[in-house]
Amino acid sequence: CGGITGILGGFKEIIIEDTDEYIIKRDELGRTSKLRKGYASIPLPLDFPVRDMDSWLKLKPMFEFREDRIDWDQVNHARKMQEKGHLVVATIPGGFDIPRELMGEETTCLCYYMQPELMEDIMQTITETSFRVLDSISEKLLIDQVSVHEDLAGKTGPLIGPNEIEIFVKPYFRKIWDMLSSKGTQLFDMDSDGDVNPIL
């Protein structure tokens, strides 16, 4: 739809080591990962950039609102495509997925209990940025659907409990959805990647 609600900027991706068996590289978030050639399509994370509030604050500007998050030419293109019958979809970062990308699954799950102020700041940041980007765009363009990539569950259930959803994730989704639905958005799509029945 012409808006970037997730990471903007970031580190330059660099290859640290490239052998016949694997590639080790650093990505835009500053994570180091290892991909085994011929065996895997998803790299194995070797480290994560966020461990505490100080390390988060170094990356926070990549997630904060900036005017250049909105490409008005793309917004106008989306409007023209919508007139031809195409669905206009906006995406927002996952309320569990972004912390997991920054900290890894284990540290993310512990963060809800051990460093709740860190989790609150991450959530407030992605909420404010997503809201401001999509609020501006939806003044000029009807967004038909909002989609969120979460991957917060496996076949045996979710990686996050109902209390954490209620406290940290639901307010984020609710604020974005209430604003967009008041302007005509009708569809909310979340990729869970597994069984989310325990947190519905």
What are the language-model segments listed below?
Residues 1-12:
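Segments that shape or occlude catalytic/ligand-binding pockets
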Residues 11, 26-27:
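Long, low-complexity intrinsically disordered regulatory regions enriched in P/S/T/G and acidic residues
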Residues 12-13, 22:
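Short, acidic/polar N-cap/turn motifs at the starts of alpha helices
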Residues 23-26, 35, 53-200:
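Active-site loop segments of alpha/beta catalytic cores
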Residues 27, 47-49:
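Cofactor-binding catalytic cores of oxidoreductases
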